[in-house]
From Swiss-Prot:
Example GO molecular function: ATP binding
Keyword ATP-binding: yes
Protein name: Chaperone protein DnaK
Disulfide bonds: none
Organism in which the protein naturally occurs: Acidithiobacillus ferrooxidans (Thiobacillus ferrooxidans)
Family: Belongs to the heat shock protein 70 family.
Amino acid sequence: AKVIGIDLGTTNSXVAVMEG
């Protein structure tokens, strides 16, 4: 999944950019 912006599904629970 590609998430650019607010991502509450990460350990950072903040603005993050994930790819994979």
